[in-house]
């Protein structure tokens, strides 16, 4: 995972990691993951995805988007975009965060998906004990939902 210097896991107040095996090719998983405008249709912890820079519905390098997740509205910018392997964006709102995704082929036509997030700022520093398990649960929902849709076919 490519981490921005300010979000190295060892130097962050909150760090969460989730992983799942998906019986779908990395390219298909990638297409679902970058189609951010459609996240609310299959990932219940996202809403109101609006692009302020970029070409909806898909993320691309330097795309900026505002969205609601975990009950908070955040502004994000894509800073890592390496199809179909790695995607990452920062997030700013009541905290600063970096959320990265890694898609690794499994050699059998499927892939392993790893998602990691680091958070910094006053809120994560004070509430790390609450935020970490919340992120892990929310991101587990995300990877399980990604598995379900990707194994079902390509996005429309």
What are these regions (language model features)?
Residues 17, 37-73, 81-86:
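Short beta-edge strand/loop motif at the mouth of beta-sheet-based domains
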Residues 50-51, 147-156:
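Short, highly charged C-terminal tails/helix-capping segments
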Residues 28-33, 39, 65, 78, ...:
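Hydrophobic pocket/interface hotspot
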Residues 18-20, 75-80, 98-105:
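Hydrophobic/aromatic beta-strand elements that line small-molecule binding cavities or substrate pockets
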Residues 91-148:
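Beta-strand/loop substructures that line and gate deep hydrophobic ligand-binding cavities in soluble
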Residues 1-54:
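Hydrophobic ligand-binding cavity/cleft-lining segments
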Residues 25, 70-72, 83-84, 94-95, ...:
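Short strand-connecting beta-turns/loops that link adjacent beta-strands
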